[in-house]
Amino acid sequence: MAKRVAEKELTDRNWDEEDEVEEMGTFSVASEEVMKNRAVKKAKRRNVGFESDSGGAFKGFKGLVVPSGGGGFSGFGGSGGKPLEGLTNGNSTDNATPFSNVKTAAEPKAAFGSFAVNGPTTLVDKKISSPKCNNSNQPPSSGPASSTACPGNAYHKQLAGLNCSVRDWIVKHVNTNPLCDLTPIFKDYERYLATIEKQLENGGGSSSESQTDRATAGMEPPSLFGSTKLQQESPFSFHGNKAEDTSEKVEFTAEKKSDAAQGATSASFSFGKKIESSALGSLSSGSLTGFSFSAGSSSLFGKDAAQSKAASSLFSAKASESPAGGGSSECRDGEEEENDEPPKVVVTEVKEEDAFYSKKCKLFYKKDNEFKEKGVGTLHLKPTATQKTQLLVRADTNLGNILLNVLIAPNMPCTRTGKNNVLIVCVPNPPLDEKQPTLPATMLIRVKTSEDADELHKILLEKKDA
């Protein structure tokens, strides 16, 4: 809507006059008949529902949706699975939650919002839907050696520890840099998960805990897990590269804790600790391995400039020691400081060797009853072979463009005007108008002082009469 225009003009004659008082109008409510004929627009949402309903790149991503089931899994990219039922630890036949004995997974706080960081649902349906121990129907024995560890229970501990470690790592780095790319994390997560599944298939349910492990579980362990047996070290590094001696090992490690009620141990994974080859060894003898992350060279979330060999690591948290780009330049010794002053333009004046008179001037030409500037240059008076005088004005440039080049004719008007001006009428060369090159024009020559103007006027009169 355009602004209101002033109703009367304010001048020096009516500035002291009072303005007429305007009455303020009031709004009136329109009747129902008028409102029926009016089109009332209402705001509507363009995208109704969640983004995954309408498709897109994250169509299958259900991580931000609260699981509808009472318990179970909701993985990194799938929907909620079925709750685990029928899991026992060998001493009781009651149904238990999948990770009741893991403290780190008791109250899961998701890195993506409100979903539990656990394994994918396909793993639940295939592998651990309802595993049971071989001796679940036998009465429990009082001896510590009679109770056997279920392979599914050990698998659950590894899976829970892996999930919790990935969750903590993601929370830490997402809080630091929310724009980081998490795609490679899930690819490596699948590799570790496949390794755990392979161990579950190869290990079977025949592994048992010895009395030595039972005795060391309650006291302060000499190693990280409290296991007195040396396991063969077989760390898994990302992209299949072996751990380098020069690089620091950032490993998933597990701390063993005693569980009096279940008679089993719970494992929690952590980053940044160097462990021995007996990592995860107390859960099952010889079938479990440690998960190591090489802090080698190229990394998604940082890079180690001191590492020379290219062992890739996607979870390397070591900050880069060298800048990523070369945007900033360092001052070196011996460099010349830049001068803020602009470079001076050096003009080489074109000299006329045979000129007997030269003077700086500014040339104007008359057009439409006003003088317009032609340029600044040097006026030269030169003798010719026909005993006439040539008036030449060259511009003060390196090229020395010719502004005016005429002969002083006997009938050429030449007058002294103004303070320091000399007025002549001639046919300009080069012409001012290419369509009418022979049309005479009035040229005004302005010099620095009045004495210079008098001298120039005197010389022009002498040469004109000669």
From Swiss-Prot:
Residues 1-22, 128-150, 200-257, 316-343 are annotated as: Disordered. SUPFAM superfamilies: PH domain-like. Residues 76-302 are annotated as: 5 X 2 AA repeats of F-G. The keyword Protein transport applies. Residues 1-14, 241-257 have a biased composition (Basic and acidic residues). Widely expressed at low levels. Highest in the developing neural tube and adult testes. There is a cross-link at residue 351 (Glycyl lysine isopeptide (Lys-Gly) (interchain with G-Cter in SUMO2)). It is found in: Nucleus, Nuclear pore complex; Nucleus membrane. CDD domains: RanBD_NUP50. Keywords: Acetylation, Isopeptide bond, Membrane, mRNA transport, Nuclear pore complex, Nucleus, Phosphoprotein, Protein transport, Repeat, Translocation, Transport, Ubl conjugation. The modification Phosphoserine is found at residues 52, 208, 234, 268, 294. Disruption phenotype: NUP50 targeted disruption results in a complex phenotype characterized by neural tube defects, exencephaly, intrauterine growth retardation, and late embryonic lethality. The modification N6-acetyllysine is found at residues 8, 82, 126, 448. The modification Phosphothreonine is found at residue 246. It is a peripheral membrane protein. GO terms for cellular component: nuclear envelope; nuclear membrane; nuclear pore; nucleoplasm; ribonucleoprotein complex. Its main location: nucleus. InterPro entries: NUP2/50/61, PH-like_dom_sf, Ran_bind_dom, RanBP1-like. Sequence repeats lie at residues 76-77, 112-113, 225-226, 271-272, 301-302. Residues 143-205 are annotated as: Binding to CDKN1B. Gene3D superfamilies: Pleckstrin-homology domain (PH domain)/Phosphotyrosine-binding domain (PTB). Does not interact with TPR. Interacts with Importin alpha-2, Importin beta, Importin beta-2, NUP153, Ran binding protein 7, CDKN1B and itself. Contains FG repeats. FG repeats are interaction sites for karyopherins (importins, exportins) and form probably an affinity gradient, guiding the transport proteins unidirectionally with their cargo through the NPC. FG repeat regions are highly flexible and lack ordered secondary structure. The overall conservation of FG repeats regarding exact sequence, spacing, and repeat unit length is limited. PANTHER family: NUCLEAR PORE COMPLEX PROTEIN NUP50 (PTHR23138:SF147), RAN BINDING PROTEIN (PTHR23138). Component of the nuclear pore complex that has a direct role in nuclear protein import. Actively displaces NLSs from importin-alpha, and facilitates disassembly of the importin-alpha:beta-cargo complex and importin recycling. Interacts with regulatory proteins of cell cycle progression including CDKN1B. This interaction is required for correct intracellular transport and degradation of CDKN1B. This is Nuclear pore complex protein Nup50. The gene is Nup50.
